Amino acid sequence: MKNLGDWIRQIRDFLETTFLQIDHWFEMNEPCRQHKPLNGGWSIDQILEHISLTNHFLLILIVKATKKSLEKKASSPNWQQEVANYSFQLEKLQQVGVHKSFYWMRPEHMEPKGDMTLVEVRLKLKEQLLQCLQVLDQLKDGEGALHKTTMTVNSLGKMDVYEYLYFLAQHGQRHLTQMENNRIEFENLSPD
């Protein structure tokens, strides 16, 4: 069984890997990135913008929960006992990363509008990764397990800061699959 420190390291690695994989898509040629799939879905550029928008709103929740976790640590001398038997919702959270594994109705404010340039989206994603890693640095001793916030997506229920960070990375993984599907369709439709 993993301890909390192992989970924190795994989450850090997963965040870094996911953001690196997402960043790769900015190097894709423009016609491929702008191709809208035949099913009416988003282009790769739109998906990248959506990832950054979703991260923005998730990070608002993560920062608030981080503050509450640190406040709880400061007011509870025995806080480590509260996280001693830590349990991470790995299986439920992994489903988030599987494209079309469940119905997901996103809020309108997370839909891409084309308000940011591709350069701005890429910069925003890099800043968001740094913000995620800073949160992990702030909560390096397990404090992130002290406060839980409800997540309604896929009936995940109450999640701590570490689970929210993992959710954020899994959301990116979900869209990596979608972008790859777009690329394959574009290549199949393109003349040789």
Please place each PLM-identified region on the residue numbering:
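Short, contiguous alpha-helical
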Residues: 33-90, 127-192
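Acidic/histidine-rich alpha-helical segments that form the ligand environment
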Residues: 18, 84-143
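Extreme N-terminal tail/first-helix region
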Residues: 1-16, 20
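Short alpha-helical hairpin
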Residues: 22-32, 99-105, 144-152
